[in-house]
């Protein structure tokens, strides 16, 4: 399995960048609304704290994580939102401190996961490297919500490659959660990275293909921007359909933006 080290390093850097955005905000700004309906900046950080806690539980306490799965199944529509709302009520200073401590513990635990161990999650079980990538994706996406709320445009980084990779790998999942049969044939996905280099997945002679900006593809698969506003294009009926349902995150179909 892949060494989790580089992925954890990217996750740490992404988390630190978001931390820097909110660390010096006046307490009242944590109540600013974000593009996610009903969610403030405090909700966004609270959600990341909660999911980092849950990921830490998945690594360190398999029985405890199984209990969380049972609770989630009992309240599938409100489980995530309820947790974010509860944590958003905590003072910003306490919330930020708790997130810093929790994510730091998670990063260290991911580095210590034995090679070959699969970690339980709300989607398929995954390696420590994949867990770090999933946390990177979510931290980037919710960080984007915070940046949008603050009117900040964040520079694209090479860390987007792992998020794009996750978006490609979850192609079939996006079809399945939308009650559609995944395409039998592979797609070519060819994206332009922030430095102008090309990132590609799939056979070069594939009939169905997706091309465009890597950053915009990441906006798409995290459902942070509407497809009509993005430099992402598809050739082929199945590839075109995928762009309308793509999601790199676990759970039911997202509502998009």
Curated annotation (Swiss-Prot):
UniProt-recorded Gene Ontology molecular function terms: metal ion binding
Gene3D superfamilies found in the cross-reference section: dinb family like domain
InterPro entries, per database record: CHP03084, DinB/YfiT-like, Maleyloyr_isom, MDMPI_metal-binding, tRNA_wybutosine-synth
Annotated SUPFAM superfamilies: DinB/YfiT-like putative metalloenzymes
GO cellular component, one term: plasma membrane
Matching Pfam families: MDMPI_N, Wyosine_form
Protein name (database record): Uncharacterized protein Rv0036c
Lineage: Bacteria, Bacillati, Actinomycetota, Actinomycetes, Mycobacteriales
